[in-house]
Amino acid sequence: MDFLAPLSAVVLTYREVGGDALGALAEEMRKCAEELAKATPMFVLHTCGRVEVYLYGASEEEVARVAARYRRFAEGVKVLRGAEAARHLFAVAAGLDSMLIGETDILGQLEEAYDRQVKAGYTRGLLKTVVERAVRVGKRVRTETGISRGPRGLGSLAVMYVSRMLDLREASVAVLGAGAVGAGLAMELAARGVKRLVVLNRTYEKAVEVANRVGGEARPLTEEEVEKCLAECDVVFSSVHTLQPVIKRVPPEARVKVIVDLGVPSSVVPNLPVAVVKIEDLRELAEEYNRERAGEVEKAWAIVDEEVARLPRLLARRYVEEATSAIMAQAMAAAEEEGKRAGCDTAVLAAKTTVKRTLLPLITKLKEMAENGKAEEAAKLIQLLQEALQS
């Protein structure tokens, strides 16, 4: 039994389409998840450089419908299946598919998306295992190679870019957004010794958490507070993902000299009367560091490929764990029911103990079979057990 075969991915990145289209597509995929994930496990990854949907157990028709929704926004959509889909996700987690090779922001964004979608019930079952493994692979690559030495991500590049325009040590700086990218920006700016640092976020508690970490001020992300920051700060970084711009105008006599827009779609209206740095402006700087990291890329890919090869057995074991857990729960419930018929707690305990002693050796053997490349045989035995319990 090939536990990777049911995995599918629909992928569109910064290479095929601009940021505004990616932002609109991300909103469409959010709606898609609300509709589809009730029946089919799903994981959506949206960053400034990509919108990717991973499905487990989806039919060909379901995958085709998701891809068709992508094509409303752009061509160049890739549909990946099985090991190819897993390899792509692992490479993304490792930073191998990013504009800045080895960047670490993507790993934080992946974890945030995973946590959010597990809580929502979208990412579950064996797809949950695939995404968990991707996070581990990303961490392993960064531990065992030097692919992330230097700038951590686009936020780091943006700080470097702005530092060539003015002295950040004498600057008041605001960061809009306290997610993975915003928090990374705040840490980078604090390390550079900015004069004053303000962190804004829609969830105020998150702004407080990040601000406390870097010795900055926290504010809620409202239109009024954004305008105050533009009036008071020399530089404003925006890492907010929103369909509507959060910076709509520059107030008269505002202090702001530079706005950095890392939002997808753009979080800044066009034609503002100050310098606006966009993601595209960072490409040349990214390529400079990519050349320095080129020697680590082969090592990183070797880890990715090793982990992809291990994944089927991990999924097989997880499948057996989930299935046998359900069988044990069903058998224990039946034992409890029979024990209650005897009319005493001792009978209930005895029935449960007997069931556990009987099933545990079998469950252990099934797990060993799955780990040793006999997942298909283990699955057939599990199906027989399930049928027996239902009869």
Curated annotation (Swiss-Prot):
Organism: Pyrobaculum calidifontis (strain DSM 21063 / JCM 11548 / VA1)
Classification via HAMAP family: Glu_tRNA_reductase (MF_00087)
Pfam families: GlutR_N (PF05201), Shikimate_DH (PF01488)
Domain remark text: Possesses an unusual extended V-shaped dimeric structure with each monomer consisting of three distinct domains arranged along a curved 'spinal' alpha-helix. The N-terminal catalytic domain specifically recognizes the glutamate moiety of the substrate. The second domain is the NADPH-binding domain, and the third C-terminal domain is responsible for dimerization.
Function: Catalyzes the NADPH-dependent reduction of glutamyl-tRNA(Glu) to glutamate 1-semialdehyde (GSA).
Quaternary data: Homodimer.
Designated name of the protein: Glutamyl-tRNA reductase 2
Family affiliation: Belongs to the glutamyl-tRNA reductase family.
Residues bound to substrate: T47, C48, G49, R50, S98, E103, T104, D105, Q109
Catalytic reaction list: (S)-4-amino-5-oxopentanoate + tRNA(Glu) + NADP(+) = L-glutamyl-tRNA(Glu) + NADPH + H(+)
Gene that specifies this protein: hemA2
GO biological process: protoporphyrinogen IX biosynthetic process from glutamate
Active site positions: C48
Note: During catalysis, the active site Cys acts as a nucleophile attacking the alpha-carbonyl group of tRNA-bound glutamate with the formation of a thioester intermediate between enzyme and glutamate, and the concomitant release of tRNA(Glu). The thioester intermediate is finally reduced by direct hydride transfer from NADPH, to form the product GSA.
Broad EC category: oxidoreductase
Recorded superkingdom: Archaea
Annotated positions for site Important for activity: H88
